[in-house]
Amino acid sequence: MAKTRLTVDTNDLASRITRAPFPGSAKIYIEGSRPDIRVPFREVTLTDTMVHEGAGEPRREANPPLRLYDASGVYTDPASPIDITRGLPPLRGAWINERADTEALPGISSAYGRERLNDPALAALRMAHAPVPRRAKAGANVSQMHYARKGIITPEMEYIAVRENLVRAQLAERLATERMPKKGHSFNASIPEQITAEFVRDEVARGRAVIPNNINHPESEPMIIGRNFLIKVNANIGNSAVTSSIEEEVDKLVWSIRWGADTVMDLSTGENIHETREWILRNSPVPIGTVPIYQALEKVNGKAEDLTWEIFRDTLIEQAEQGVDYFTIHAGVRLAYVPLTANRLTGIVSRGGSIMAKWCLSHHKESFLYERFDEICEIMKAYDVCFSLGDGLRPGSIADANDEAQFAELHTLGELTQIAWKHDVQVMIEGPGHVPLQLVKENVDKQLEACFEAPFYTLGPLITDISPGYDHISSAMGAANIGWYGTAMLCYVTPKEHLGLPNRDDVKQGLIAYKIAAHAGDLAKGYPGAQMWDNAVSKARFEFRWEDQFRLAIDPDTAMAYHDETLPKENAKVAHFCSMCGPKFCSMKISQEVREFARLNPASTTLAAPGVIAIKQIDSGFEEKAKEFREGGSEIYS
């Protein structure tokens, strides 16, 4: 086992971080009702369309810039100074303080946290400026759901409304010149034409959406997860007992949000988990999730049977005081459900699920996560940590999909959701897994019913098991479908799934696949404004605005690199063809010529029937072109 260095190379860390804005893009901010609500977007500048009208110089027609949702934080803003050793500025600090329902603690509450703090050997691993943890005042509930149910619109809710409403804000100005969006099918979702702060509040109050914003993670930019909002994507990072370092994990965090991760889960299972998580949280503008049972297991040297409620409780408090925004807790794995997995092809594949199943069998007792669930809720609402109720019995192969064990646990998760909501604690529900395409929709339908429309958060699902090395592709297919049916957040899968710990490039590949899947789901639902991005790409493609195509691509770097592999010269970026078809066979160039012919020969475009050019005029055009061909020497290529 590789030992982690007991130091952090801050120079190496700073040099790893990618800070450059995307090509042709700038970070802009839209202000809300108060100066400290500044919502970031990526604005893509587009070049003019050249309109040819005869022999003279072409007329320029401006293309307005396109604004895109941006979760990359200040890392893509060259105007914002960043000091990784100090972390990001506390964006939400003033909002938390002005509510006057939290208090700074005199010190760290968890025994393990104090032990780490007092170990001089770890001094060089710790951040130099760790913030003082906060907790709700006695008797207070500081969850966003609690505020929402009291009718309070928080700054976080307004921030989210501006963020989610962006595409709608651009819609009116573009509809005059763009194709109308294709009609979507939302499967009875309640997606409004305009997102308001009141709509955000109402969705959170109903439990149909969550705002994962721990009071001890003031650096985070508010975001929302719910099926009536844009589909979100989560990326998993974290060290293992075999490999990785703090520098690597912080770099993977920043790399993940650059490529579109809306939340990040730290699934570290190696050394110095506490310190690694602190560096990640302090430098993260997106919500951070964890699976606390992983660290609790490390505290008992990997022996599941030695876990206790006291150790788990201390771990929850430790992580909540660091600022973790949501916990995956496998409280639905009950003793009675474990035998239901006996005849499965792949048994229990969830790490957290298998840990709790082993504990239940070792003690022949009900899980302490289930029996102590009310006590867990008390901790969650004191810090505003959101539940991500884990699917510990999810299928690990399509042979096991939608079986009795999976759905038994799902109904228990619905029961636990109701308990959490009595405490005004936010909840989302985790889902599979491995599910063949024809069974995907059943998962969403059953989850919406069993869990009262709490947001669904799924790992894929993979729709086939034959794709090791390409699981990001097979799972993105399932993700696009399950997102369309109503899943609120998709957990990415990388090419290394089932094979090894993902590296930097694997993280990017997984995220690109899943951002495409999420966008496809938004399009299919008919999410207002989602098609604007597609229209902008298509218009640039038809007009051979190559630079704009690269800028608008979900991965500009790769789009440009692929183009330049065969046509590297700068003049190729204004050419009306690419290396796929060449100058003679480009369908879009030919289509432009047909359009120009129709413009110059209006008499030749009289319609004999709707959408059909009169046959005589077509024949005339053919004869003219045939004559040109013969006079040109009858050569196919000149």
Curated annotation (Swiss-Prot):
EC nos: 4.1.99.17
Reactions this protein catalyses: 5-amino-1-(5-phospho-beta-D-ribosyl)imidazole + S-adenosyl-L-methionine = 4-amino-2-methyl-5-(phosphooxymethyl)pyrimidine + CO + 5'-deoxyadenosine + formate + L-methionine + 3 H(+)
Keyword annotations: 4Fe-4S, Iron, Iron-sulfur, Lyase, Metal-binding, S-adenosyl-L-methionine, Thiamine biosynthesis, Zinc
InterPro entries, A to Z: ThiC (IPR037509), ThiC-associated_dom (IPR025747), ThiC/Bza_core_dom (IPR038521), ThiC/BzaA/B (IPR002817)
Keyword Metal-binding set for record: yes
Biological process, per Gene Ontology: thiamine biosynthetic process; thiamine diphosphate biosynthetic process
Domain of life: Bacteria
GO annotation, cellular component aspect: cytosol
Cofactor(s) this protein requires: [4Fe-4S] cluster
Pathway(s) this gene product operates in, as recorded in its UniProt entry: Cofactor biosynthesis; thiamine diphosphate biosynthesis
Binding site for substrate: N236, M265, Y294, H330, S350, R351, G352, D391, G392, L393, R394, E430, Y457
Co-factor binding details: Binds 1 [4Fe-4S] cluster per subunit. The cluster is coordinated with 3 cysteines and an exchangeable S-adenosyl-L-methionine.
Protein family according to the UniProt entry: Belongs to the ThiC family.
UniProt name for this protein: Phosphomethylpyrimidine synthase
Native organism: Polaromonas sp. (strain JS666 / ATCC BAA-500)
